[in-house]
Amino acid sequence: MNDRVEEIRGVRVLVCAEEGEKLAGEGDINDFLGKAWELEATMVAIPVARLADDFFRLRTRLAGAVVQKFVNYRLRLAVLGDISAWIAESDALRDFVREANRGRDIWFAADLAELRSRL
């Protein structure tokens, strides 16, 4: 399956496919942002499989860089998939996810169905 845009309750969401380029470094962020802008999406839903492990290791600061860039460009981000193993290893990540899910710009959801219900 390819990346696609899906309209969910008035929100244009770029739903990234499970397979494809990984977001592995700060330089990769622009690829996802560019595609969102090109397709006029206001939210990007990225599966866990498309994120490098460093995203979940907060000490690498990759997650912070991703979040900052999305916020700066006024795009919302949803991370889709099971991150329970990562949360079990890191209290800081658990707190980060909990705080993100309280907000409006960055969400972590189990799957696209959960994202649909939140929007």
Tell where the protein language model's regions lie, with residue ranges.
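Amphipathic, Lys/Arg-enriched alpha-helical "gate/interface" segment within cytosolic domains
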Residues: 2-119
